[in-house]
Structure formats: structure tokens, C-alpha cells
A protein has these predicted regions:
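Short, non-transmembrane alpha-helical segments in secretory-pathway proteins
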Residues: 78, 82-103, 244-258, 300-341, ...
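Exposed beta-strand-loop-beta-strand "reactive/processing" segments of non-cytosolic proteins
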Residues: 250-296, 324-377, 427-457
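N-terminal Sec-pathway targeting helices
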Residues: 1-15, 23-26
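A short, surface-exposed beta-strand/turn
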Residues: 175-194, 284-295, 357-383, 454-484
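Secondary-structure junction/capping motif
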Residues: 53-54, 60-61, 308, 369, ...
Length: 484
């Protein structure tokens, strides 16, 4: 950030004034609380990064070396046992490469995936230097600026070669780190077993196809027999019972965001929102939009260094464990922010598949993702969540009979009809997920990303074809530790 001292002072004064006005509006009627009381202690359980940063990933694929893959989302908030094992191996591989140079090369997915491996996939680009911030002495001979895949190929035994590939799927460039001394590699090797989810199996397009259109490696589900019967989802509001807000449920969650919680701090404002506050924290729940919002004003006006990428991720995940109402798995969907703030965006996942919020839901809640966590100065400054959970119906009440290749054909046809006549030269992504456009009977859809458009394709051929088209934002690189 390019600031001189005068500009810095002005900005701080303006921010404090804005915060004061906001605090007056939100805390009206709570005059017994001194808004600017200096509270130096922070809630350690919410703000500390863990001792061993787990490997962040949107999703990860496990390959058994025999062309069988399983795809998972984190089964704990922000991590999983498998990701923790993978992180141990990656740290050992990188540590062994300190002082060594790497060469930029083209990614060969067939070679990468022919052995047991774990592939971390991200739905956004990550700056290479930021990710390796803790290992500045690692050399990257011909710089790989950013990546969206990490593939770890562990050795069967200590003394054999383990590899870590960082891949940029846009350019197909990669760098490879090799190590012979990883003690954790054999543990990960034994744990890597692909376990298909019932009738659904995954293939790697990088290993199985040579199509010029599918240039990026994608892990896509397919079925030997169709139709495939599955459970729809229903939406469960986190703080409601019998159609009304439960104060008990709300207070049980609210108390975990405060050091010394008291129900005397709560009120309902003129808009019907439930507000809990003390001298530094405001927690608000809007029953109309079902938005839960947390603000910590201790961090406003601070101008410290930006929190490291992985530290901020762990701080976000640790903070979310304080939300007792969060009962659905979440995954990292994106990272953004500006100045010394980093924003981590999360979405829900059920039964190993993502839940995508419809555009109408996004407009209602004012967010593109289900959860936003803003980290500044190694603390959570803001937490916003669409406070619902999703659960399976348990009834096998929906049917799927459209494979991904058919969905791609349908999206291609829609592109020609609704956007422009153009030969599709690159498919950015194909994903299967639940489309949360209702509260009951939430079904699976194909989401096909062609250039700057996402097409929703029906998975049940007996239902009317979707014509929904969503414009996407240009893909940017996450730069989460360099001030600009």
C-alpha cells in the first residue's frame, strides 16, 4: 500500500468516525456498554492459527494408481485426516528442497496420476510466493507465478522418491519438487485408497481423454448404469423451530462469540433483527434473510502487515468452529480482499458434493457465497453466514441420467444459441452439485463453465432443459500477503 503518513492519519480518522457512527446505530439502547473500551484480550479459541497449518483445498482427489479416483470435500471445518497426512508429506518434500532450483515444465497428467497420489484442486488461482511464504529460501528457477493444483505422489518406502507438483491449469505449466527422505510418505501411501461413492465413480480427464477442448484436468463423476437414484436436499434454518426463531438456539450460538456472554446484552432493533453486543463485538441475526453477522471493532483502524495466506485460512476455520449452529460441511470457494484484509469465502457441501446458491438467494443475502470470513492482523474482523444447514431427504427421491459429456454438449449448444456462434476451444470447468434455488427437493445439476459463462444443465432428461446462464468474473490470482 502506497501511503504517506498524512494520508494514513486521515484514513484512520475517517475509519474511526465511520465505525463510531455504525456502532451508535447498532448499539442504540445499549448505552451501558462502553463501545471504545480497550479490551486487549482476544478470544484465543477463535483467533489463533493452529500449530500445524493444514493444507487448504477446495476439494481433493485420491488416486489408487489404477485409474480409480474418489473426490472429497473437507470432512472437518477446513481440513480432513487425509489432508493433514498430505500436508505432512508436502512440508517434508519442500524442506528437502530448500536451496535447490526447480525448472518450469509442462504438466504431464498421465505421468502424475499413474501412481498413488492425492490431488488438491482450487477453484481460484493462488500466488506461488504467497503460498510458500514460510519457506522463502526455496528456489523457483523459472518462476511459476500462480497455481490451482497441487499433486503429491508419495513414496512407498522412506528412501524412495516422493514428488510434489504445483500446476497452473491455465498455462499447463508446473514445477516439481522431489525428495528422498520423507518419513510421512509411506503413511500417506498406505492411506490412499480410492473408495467409489456407491454407483458413482470418478475419472480424470487429463488421464483418460486427449480432447483439445478438455485441456485442463478435471475429476468428473460417471455411472456405469443409469438412471442413478439419489437423495434430494432440504434446507433447515439454523435458528428456527416450528417456523419461528428459537431464542434458545440463537443464544446458544451467540454466547460462543463473546468472552463473558449475557442475555441482557440482546435486543431487537427496529427492523426485527436480533442484536447481541458488548464493548467490542456485535452479533446480529436477520430472521428475514437468515443472515448471521459478527463484527469485531477492536481491529478497525489497524494498519499492520497482512496475515499470511495459510495462517488466515486456519484462523478462519478455527473461528467457524465457534458457530455451534454450523452443522453442514463447508469448503473453501475463493479468497479475496484488499489492503491488510483477506476475505475467505466458503460454501456448503453435502454427501461429497457442493451446494451452489442460486442467483436469487445470492441477491437476497447480499453474498455470492454462503460464508465470508474477513481476517485482519491475525484476527477475525468480520464473519457473515447464510445461517441454514442442508440435510439429505433419505428417500432416493430424484433421478439422474445425464452424463457429463452430454451436459457439455448441451452447454455448447446453449452457448451457440444464447451468446455467440463460436467454436468452444476450452472448458474452464464442469461440476456436479446441488442447486439451492428452493428449500425442499434440492436436486443435482451440471454446472458447465465455458469462457465467461456458467450454464446450468439438467441431470434428469425427463425434466425441462435449463437455459440459465450466469456471467462469471475474470479469474484472478489470490495475492494474500503482499501489500499493494
Amino acid at each position: 500500500m502506497k501511503r504517506n503518513r498524512i494520508t494514513n492519519v486521515i484514513i484512520v480518522v475517517l475509519v474511526i468516525a465511520a465505525v463510531y457512527q455504525t456502532g451508535e446505530l447498532w448499539l442504540e439502547g445499549t448505552a451501558g456498554h462502553n463501545f471504545f473500551r480497550a479490551v486487549k484480550e482476544s478470544i484465543s479459541a477463535t483467533d489463533e492459527a493452529s500449530e500445524s497449518d493444514a493444507l487448504l483445498a477446495t476439494r481433493y482427489a485420491v488416486g489408487d494408481g489404477a485409474s480409480n479416483f474418489s473426490v472429497y470435500y473437507p470432512d472437518k471445518v477446513g481440513s480432513s485426516d487425509m489432508l493433514e497426512k498430505a500436508n505432512d508429506v508436502l512440508q517434508e518434500i519442500l524442506a528437502e528442497n530448500i536451496g535447490e532450483s526447480t525448472e518450469l515444465e509442462k504438466a504431464d497428467w498421465k505421468e502424475m496420476l499413474q501412481n498413488k497420489c492425492i490431488v488438491m484442486q482450487y477453484d481460484f488461482m493462488i500466488n506461488m510466493d504467497d503460498y510458500l511464504e514460510g519457506m522463502r529460501s526455496l528456489k523457483n528457477g523459472q518462476d511459476l507465478d500462480s497455481f490451482d493444483y497441487i499433486t503429491i505422489v508419495p513414496a512407498r518406502r522412506t528412501g524412495e522418491e516422493s514428488k510434489a507438483y504445483f500446476v497452473n491449469s491455465q498455462t499447463n505449466d508446473c514445477v516439481v519438487y522431489r525428495a528422498m527422505k520423507s518419513k510421512s510418505a509411506p503413511i500417506l501411501f498406505e492411506a490412499l485408497q480410492a473408495e467409489p461413492e456407491g454407483e458413482m465413480v470418478y475419472i480424470s480427464t487429463g488421464q483418460k481423454t486427449s480432447s483439445a477442448v478438455l485441456r485442463r484436468n478435471l475429476f468428473l463423476p460417471q455411472w456405469a448404469e443409469l438412471p442413478y437414484q439419489y437423495d434430494t436436499l432440504r434446507q433447515v434454518p439454523a435458528f428456527e423451530q416450528d417456523g419461528a426463531v428459537s431464542r434458545v438456539l440463537l443464544e446458544n450460538t451467540a454466547e460462543r462469540f463473546f468472552r463473558n456472554f449475557s442475555v441482557d446484552w440482546s435486543q431487537r432493533d427496529e427492523n426485527g433483527n436480533f442484536v447481541f453486543s458488548d464493548s467490542s463485538v456485535v452479533l446480529r441475526y436477520n430472521p428475514g434473510s437468515r443472515m448471521l453477522e459478527y463484527y469485531n471493532y477492536e481491529n478497525y483502524g489497524s494498519d499492520g502487515p497482512k496475515t499470511a495466506l495459510l495462517d488466515g485460512y486456519q484462523i478462519s476455520c478455527n473461528f467457524m468452529t465457534n458457530d455451534a449452529s454450523l452443522q453442514t460441511d463447508v469448503y473453501l470457494a475463493d479468497i479475496g480482499g484488499s489492503g491488510n484484509e483477506t476475505v475467505y469465502y466458503f460454501d456448503y457441501a453435502v454427501n461429497g458434493l457442493p451446494v451452489y446458491l442460486s442467483e436469487s438467494v445470492q441477491q437476497e443475502i447480499g453474498m455470492k457465497h454462503a460464508i465470508e470470513v474477513t481476517v485482519s492482523n491475525n484476527s477475525v474482523k468480520k464473519y457473515r453466514r447464510y445461517a441454514v444447514n442442508y440435510e439429505a431427504s433419505g428417500a432416493k427421491d430424484a433421478s439422474l441420467d445425464v452424463q457429463f459429456i452430454d451436459a457439455l454438449d448441451a452447454a455448447n449448444r446453449l452457448y451457440q444459441e444464447t451468446v455467440e456462434q463460436r467454436e468452444i476451444a476450452d472448458v474452464k470447468n464442469i461440476a456436479l452439485g446441488y442447486f439451492a434455488d428452493r428449500t425442499e427437493g434440492i436436486r443435482l445439476q451440471w454446472f458447465v463453465n465455458l469462457y465467461d459463462r456458467i450454464f446450468l444443465i439438467e441431470t434428469d432428461s425427463t425434466l425441462p432443459e435449463q437455459t440459465a446462464v450466469t456471467e462469471t468474473e475474470p479469474e484472478t490470482v489470490v495475492n494474500a500477503s503482499t501489500n499493494s
